Swiss-Prot record:
E.C. number: 1.8.1.2
Needed co-factor(s): siroheme; [4Fe-4S] cluster
Metabolic or biological pathway, per its Swiss-Prot or TrEMBL entry: Sulfur metabolism; hydrogen sulfide biosynthesis; hydrogen sulfide from sulfite (NADPH route): step 1/1
Listed GO CC annotations: sulfite reductase complex (NADPH)
Transmembrane segments: none
SUPFAM superfamilies: Nitrite and sulphite reductase 4Fe-4S domain-like, Nitrite/Sulfite reductase N-terminal domain-like
Binding locations of [4Fe-4S] cluster: 434, 440, 479, 483
Role description: Component of the sulfite reductase complex that catalyzes the 6-electron reduction of sulfite to sulfide. This is one of several activities required for the biosynthesis of L-cysteine from sulfate.
Record's cofactor remark: Binds 1 siroheme per subunit.
Amino acids binding siroheme: 483
Source species: Salmonella heidelberg (strain SL476)
Name assigned to this protein: Sulfite reductase [NADPH] hemoprotein beta-component
Top-level taxonomy: Bacteria, Pseudomonadati, Pseudomonadota, Gammaproteobacteria, Enterobacterales
Keyword Metal-binding attached: yes
Enzyme class at the top of the EC tree: oxidoreductase
């Protein structure tokens, strides 16, 4: 990025309506409690439609039947998505059994959706079941607070089953950061858990009365794995270890992938290195980054409000100096680190603690009983006998963690009998999509329902060119908000309209480069024609170990994005 054009620290102007809503909400209460009792509509009205997001929910409807219901003069079939707060993706088997039962008994779709933010979502919760879902989560020690809207969202942590001691330390920090940055309002407990109102005034010492200007995402990452895709996140703590023990973090700030089609003020951006900090300063630094973004982020234009834009406007050195001032530290020079991959190691891995860990590939994270593959039942049966925990990965897979040797055969038998260990290609293991249709209101094109058959066709191209065991990191996202993280893929498809996508190429396998748009608004046959030609060239012309994305850059097929604020749209 450039320091040549620093802008104002605070953007003056008329505040966005979201700022009015937050200010008037009485610390996120609004009239949600009253709205719950309105049986005339299946949805939430007015500001409450947006306020429920702070409580971990989005109001959606089934877009497959929207037109049909409109023709019948019925309102859309409103139902809520709920996203759990689950730092590092760790969930106990007792908790898993509770969420399995709720999904079966109280959701329209009956599924559990693992997400690439290391948590799970329920889709299709009717309004009458909204309060019960929060109470169910609370009863097993979980909540949905701050998993959506203008807060620090679910904190990610590398799912490294081999480095068990290091993972345990990093996971503890992910939990501490998550807890430290949580909102302090009692609105969640009052509305959902029926806790009595306390006479004291609410205060938000970190987030402030109007919370953050926009969503904020945090990771703790253990090199050499970049499984959590740090460059998609606002604030990243890269673990630095000595003799297998965590000693501190490198801090990287200002990553983010969401854009708006045709809006050249928006761009995907990788995170910038700030420096190294010893462990004892972690929470102070996390708070300083968040409060600097709170005070300097753009509250007049939500499309330009994320940390990545603040960093570009004020300049990296200015932002970094303010974080140092607020945290009371000076960053040390970045310590050496490198990434070698970001996919999950599917199958059994033995940890240095001699426990076994079984990583199960879950296509698109959708846990459901399919014909001949009862995945949901299989995981429930494993949860009933497993003494360790489950870990949800940022690749939408699931790890059965900490399995003793004596239980290994029994758990493998259950997994195999329920279709949880069916062999899949390396290409399928490295392909991912967001939910999109039918539930996401922002979806422009299919993603989760499109990817499996599209992957079949890409597998056929690899087979045709004699490289069936190769893989290309491939992501499909249904709209430019980018939940599928296509903007860090070697092949990224971004939904433009039904059946049409923008094709991005030139990312790399380790997730440190933004791909550039190669072709705009094209159909699946056009995409496959382009990929067929380019994969053929890659198979013939690549250098030893060269990934597809690196090849497209070296061969001059695509220019690399070097400074997204300046050249993302070129």
């Amino acid at each position: 990025m450039s320091e040549k054009h620093p802008g104002p620290l605070v953007v003056e102007g008329k505040l966005s309506d979201a700022e009015r809503m937050k200010l008037e909400s009485n610390y996120l209460r609004g009239t949600i409690a009253e709205d719950l009792n309105d049986g005339l509509t299946g949805g939430f009205k007015g500001d409450n439609f947006l306020l429920i997001r702070f409580h971990g929910m989005y109001q959606q409807d089934d877009r497959d039947i929207r037109a049909e219901r409109a023709a019948q003069k019925l309102e859309p079939r409103h139902a809520m998505l709920l996203r759990c707060r689950l730092p590092g993706g760790v969930i106990t088997t007792t908790q898993w059994q509770a969420i399995d039962k709720f999904a079966a008994d109280n959701t329209i779709y009956g599924s559990i959706r693992l997400t690439n933010r290391q948590t799970f979502q329920f889709h299709g919760i009717l309004k009458k079941n909204v309060k019960p879902v929060h109470q169910m989560l609370h009863s097993v020690g979980l909540d949905a607070l701050a998993t959506a809207n203008d807060m620090n969202r679910n904190v990610l942590c590398t799912s490294n089953p081999y480095e068990s001691q290091l993972h345990a330390e990093a996971y503890e920090w992910a939990k501490k950061i998550s807890e430290h940055l949580l909102p302090r309002t009692r609105a969640y407990a009052e509305i959902w858990l029926d806790q009595e109102k306390v006479a004291t005034t609410d205060e938000e010492p970190i987030l402030g009365q109007t919370y953050l200007p926009r969503k904020f995402k945090t990771t703790v990452v253990i090199p050499p794995q970049n499984d959590i895709d740090l460059h998609a996140n606002d604030m990243n703590f890269v673990a630095i270890a000595e003799n297998g023990k965590l000693v501190g973090f490198n801090l990287l700030v200002g990553g983010g992938l969401s854009i708006e089609h045709g809006n050249k003020k928006t761009y995907a951006r990788t995170a910038s290195e700030f420096g190294y900090l010893p462990l004892e300063h972690t929470l102070a630094v996390a708070e300083a980054v968040v409060t600097t973004q709170r005070d300097w982020g753009n509250r007049t234009d939500r499309k330009n409000a994320k940390t990545k834009y603040t960093l570009e406007r004020v300049g990296l050195e200015t932002f970094k100096a303010e974080v140092e001032r607020r945290a009371g530290i000076k960053f040390e020079p970045i310590r050496p680190y490198e990434f070698t991959g970001r996919g999950d190691r599917i199958g059994w891995v033995k940890g240095i603690d001699n426990n076994w860990h079984l990583t199960l590939f879950i296509e698109n994270g959708r846990i459901l009983d399919y014909p001949g593959r009862p995945l949901k039942t299989g995981l429930l049966e494993i949860a009933k006998i497993h003494q360790g925990e489950f870990r949800i990965t940022a690749n939408q897979n699931l790890i059965i963690a900490s399995v003793p040797e004596s239980q290994k055969a029994k758990i493998e038998t259950l997994a195999r009998d329920h279709g949880l260990m069916n062999a899949v290609s390396a290409q399928r293991e490295n392909s991912m999509a967001c939910v999109s249709f039918p539930t996401c209101p922002l979806a422009m094109a299919e993603a989760e329902r499109f990817l499996p058959s599209f992957t079949d066709k890409v597998e056929a191209i690899l087979e045709k060119h004699g490289i069936p065991d190769e893989h290309i990191v491939m992501r499909v996202t249904g709209c430019p908000n980018g939940c599928g993280r296509a903007m860090l893929a070697e092949i990224g498809l971004v939904g433009k309209a039904p059946g049409r996508y923008n094709l991005h190429l030139g990312g790399n396998r380790i997730g440190t480069r933004i791909p550039r748009m190669y072709k705009e608004n094209i159909t699946e046959p056009d995409i496959l024609a382009s990929l067929g030609e380019l994969i053929g060239r890659w198979a013939k012309e690549r250098e030893a170990g060269e990934g597809f994305g690196d090849f497209t850059v070296r061969a001059g097929i695509i220019r690399p994005v070097l400074d997204p604020a300046r050249d993302f749209w070129e």
